[in-house]
């Protein structure tokens, strides 16, 4: 039975794990790292780079290197958070055909789901390389506070990557699974997850294989990226103060500043001071300019203090919704790279009144939890029951634009809830059901997930028709809504697809694009491998021709030289063709066989001559000796 893998699709880094016997195991990627940067880059010649190779060239190709795209997934272009991000990233955020926020590279638009799919493909390939078999099914994690549109977009990304997404699981819940799988005694834990782009807090009761989420809260636009940008803004301001030059519009400089900010932030988690040194950051009429600045931990903490404080309100709300006090929390589990920051740990300690648990790897624990959930679905992990919740209230818009809740936030999923509504006007023959998600009292202030019409109602006075609206949330947190006229039995239902979102046709097209990209990538890799083999053969044949060319005929020498020239020409072509290189490599191997034969004969002749010489040299000094065979029995006696 093919393995189901667990993937933590992160804002900054992604990670893949699989069940290995009874334990979950993180799989190393082709570069030998346990996590992969969630970055995709497109070079000028159209080559696509994913992960570490994309990160390595980001400084020289800032406008075509896409990162932190998870923050845009499932969001409309007009979203205020998207507006904020537009001014902070070196690449272009554009309006997609469906009104969603898309990204642009080399003049071509990509949906965030497409870019996420490229990262998922890399995770899929990493797992396939380790397992030695095709992988087609996965469990993928999302921030607990993701709304329906964001969850659906993540599922779409999986489909584009060629994966059947068996389950979408919340990141804090996955972390709790990995942390508590071997815990038998009952505990109430808080999972504080501050990652690269999102923040989640979940309160769970765990024990004896049951993981019950009591409440969840968070902020889907708060994470390490914001900390980095805060530091970049400070560096830009300091440089302007000292040199009178504004680096804000210099995309190359901004990318270098971002890398330096991330590095400094990480260093300051273990040291009190670091130095940021960026030579030749820019130049003016007087010559090149360099940025050198000492940064203390205290300064960094003062710059990001409000960001850390923003995590407190969601924590308090989650405690309140779960009906517990901070003192009743037995353990606080830290997840996400930003939880390594001493200031964050200090705030968590003050809030919960206890030292947070640091026994799990914050970068890997979510992927491990996803792999455990994959094991549960596959039947490899027994006696585990996971009860998650919906993070936001769901309802419909009713008379006066009021948001009428059908399912309250923190309701255990899967769940189903029905409520009966009626018409607002006489002789109304159709009703529009507008489905929203959020906590505000007016529907317009919440996230509109989608809408549909129930038509064909018989003309009646207002208030008479009985329209039953049913919400059905599956274990992935994805919503299906139906409306039924009790009088006529007419029913209309939809799987909620965000008013933007990707249509089935869009997804199908992107799947085909991804497949053709995979074929292109394979072709490119084959060309590189063929080229490497060819260059190695050219080098060894040229050396042999130089050393032993006089041992073969003039015609053979010419044939070998011509074959070398033809193969060199094939490897140096702009669009290297793997099949052409392989054919010409084969030709060179065949024509150089006579050269190989000549080398072999020459070596044999040398070896024979050397043997004769040593026999002649040592002939007079040969000593004849008598020897006596000692049997094992005699040896034992003498011992």
Curated annotation (Swiss-Prot):
Compositionally biased residues, Low complexity: 604-613
InterPro entries linked to this entry: ATPase_NBD, Chaperone_DnaK, Heat_shock_70_CS, HSP70_C_sf, HSP70_peptide-bd_sf, Hsp_70_fam
Extent of Basic and acidic residues compositional bias: 514-529
Induction info: By stress conditions e.g. heat shock.
Keyword Phosphoprotein: yes
Job description of the protein: Acts as a chaperone.
Protein name: Chaperone protein DnaK
Organism of provenance: Rhizobium etli (strain CIAT 652)
């Amino acid at each position: 039975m093919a393995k189901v893998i667990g993937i933590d699709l992160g804002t900054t880094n992604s990670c893949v794990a699989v069940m290995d016997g009874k334990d979950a195991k993180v799989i190393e990627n082709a570069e030998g790292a346990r996590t992969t940067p969630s970055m995709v880059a497109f070079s000028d010649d159209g080559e696509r780079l994913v992960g570490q190779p994309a990160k390595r060239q980001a400084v020289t190709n800032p406008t075509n290197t896409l990162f932190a795209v998870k923050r845009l997934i499932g969001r409309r272009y007009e979203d205020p958070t998207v507006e904020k991000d537009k001014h902070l990233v070196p690449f272009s955020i554009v309006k997609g055909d469906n009104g969603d926020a898309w990204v642009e590279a080399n003049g071509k638009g990509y949906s965030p789901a497409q870019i996420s799919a490229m990262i998922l493909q890399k995770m899929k390939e990493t797992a396939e390389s380790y397992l030695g078999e095709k992988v087609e099914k996965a469990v993928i994690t999302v921030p607990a506070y993701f709304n329906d549109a964001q969850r659906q977009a993540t599922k779409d990304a999986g489909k584009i990557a060629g994966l059947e997404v068996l389950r979408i699981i919340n990141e804090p819940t996955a972390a709790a699974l990995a942390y508590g799988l071997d815990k038998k005694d009952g505990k109430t834990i808080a999972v504080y997850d501050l990652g690269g782009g999102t923040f989640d807090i979940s309160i769970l009761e765990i024990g004896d294989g049951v993981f019950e989420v009591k409440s969840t809260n968070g902020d889907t636009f708060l994470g390490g990226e914001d900390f980095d940008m805060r530091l970049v803004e400070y560096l830009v301001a300091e440089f302007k103060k000292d040199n009178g030059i504004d680096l804000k519009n210099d995309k190359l400089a901004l990318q270098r500043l971002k890398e330096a900010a991330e590095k400094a932030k990480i260093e300051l988690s273990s040291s009190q001071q670091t130095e940021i040194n960026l030579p030749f950051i820019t130049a003016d009429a007087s010559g090149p300019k360099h940025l050198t600045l000492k940064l203390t931990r205290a300064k960094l903490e003062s710059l990001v203090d409000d960001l850390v404080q923003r995590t407190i309100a969601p924590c308090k709300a989650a405690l309140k919704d779960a009906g517990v006090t901070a003192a009743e929390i037995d353990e606080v589990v830290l997840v996400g790279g930003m939880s390594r920051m001493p200031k964050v740990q200090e705030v968590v300690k003050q809030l919960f009144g206890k030292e947070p648990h640091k026994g799990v790897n914050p970068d890997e624990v979510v992927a491990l939890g996803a792999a455990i959930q994959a094991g549960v679905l596959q039947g490899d992990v027994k006696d585990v029951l996971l009860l998650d919740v919906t993070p936001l209230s769901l309802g419909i818009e009713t008379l006066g634009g009021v948001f009428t809740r059908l399912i309250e936030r923190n309701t255990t999923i899967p769940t189903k809830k029905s409520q009966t509504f009626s018409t607002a006007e006489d002789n109304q023959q159709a009703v529009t059901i507008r489905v929203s998600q959020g906590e505000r009292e007016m529907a317009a202030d919440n996230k509109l997930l989608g809408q549909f019409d129930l038509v064909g109602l018989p003309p009646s006075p207002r208030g008479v028709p009985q329209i039953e609206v049913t919400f059905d949330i599956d274990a992935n947190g994805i919503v299906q809504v139906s409306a039924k006229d009790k009088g006529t039995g007419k029913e209309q239902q939809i799987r909620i697809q965000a008013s933007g979102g990707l249509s089935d046709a869009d997804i199908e097209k992107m799947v085909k694009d991804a497949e053709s990209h995979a074929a292109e990538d394979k072709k490119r890799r084959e060309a590189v491998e063929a080229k490497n083999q060819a260059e190695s053969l050219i080098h060894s044949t040229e050396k042999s021709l130089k050393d032993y060319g006089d041992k073969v005929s003039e015609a053979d020498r010419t044939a070998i030289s011509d074959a070398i020239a033809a193969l060199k020409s094939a490897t140096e072509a702009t669009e290297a063709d793997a099949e052409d290189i392989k054919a010409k490599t084969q030709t060179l191997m065949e024509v150089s066989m006579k050269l190989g034969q000549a080398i072999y004969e020459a070596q044999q002749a040398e070896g024979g001559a050397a043997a004769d010489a040593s026999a002649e040299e040592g002939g007079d000094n040969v000593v004849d000796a008598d020897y006596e065979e000692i049997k094992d029995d005699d040896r034992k006696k003498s011992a």
